[in-house]
């Protein structure tokens, strides 16, 4: 919470990691009870969370701004990234910038500044944290089912980057960033009226044109299908590069071919023990299925098959012809 325009820099810049807003909620509640004005800015879920804590509190002095959200990556993953790749646990990290315009302009790239004055710059395809974040491989599971990335929005105003603005109107971009501002309520109208004449560009566009950009305005971004595999690899000790590569390309270190699907408990226990021993070495395992008699053949419903589905990664079933 800031009290002076001089401190606005503390609120600026993108922060692509989940934040704990619980203390801020208590502070906002206290300030509102004092009869003071509060402008709260956060993701849609954080705005909704704030309102949920303010029952029986006069909120006439509260103005809320929600951000169109890509989803929040795991805080532990971010902490591990800073420690393993940048030596945060050794006191080497001074600052992290997810979108540093000084180096990359209006874009999504990673900058880490070190205490010795050196700087790390990587594009979104080069940096392992960004590479997993943008396709929603590393975002939290519940972000893929967000209840707040929809219309009507939770905040009095919604803000977002207007990605693709040059396709809409080239005159509306200077390469430094153009924002979408959605006014959602009478409180939002008050805010916008107070700042409208201070904006460098102030053009009204149809809501349908915003929806066409594919932004998370009326829908959330779904988790990537490879998300679970990615975190399995991370949990098993893989680097972020290897976890991403194996999850995206469906790669494994070891393949086991045999009668692991055999309908007797001895076979099930033996192959499970082998599977777990290999995994204990930090290796990923694919259980290779027997050839199918014909293309598209299903798998029998046996206790061994049900056990395998719960504990293994299984290959598809191919005919001998398909495997050639």
What spans do the regions from the language model cover?
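Hydrophobic anchor at the start of a short beta-strand
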Residues: 38, 62, 254, 283-286
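Short amphipathic alpha-helix
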Residues: 268-278
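Iron-sulfur-associated redox domains of electron-transfer enzymes in respiratory
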Residues: 1-250
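Active-site donor-binding segments of glycosyltransferases and PAPS-dependent sulfotransferases
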Residues: 281-324
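Active-site catalytic pocket residues across diverse enzymes, especially alpha/beta-hydrolases
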Residues: 54-57, 278, 282
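Short N-terminal binding/cap micro-motifs at the start of the first secondary-structure element
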Residues: 190, 262-267
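Nucleotide-activated donor-dependent transferases that construct or modify glycoconjugates
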Residues: 252-262
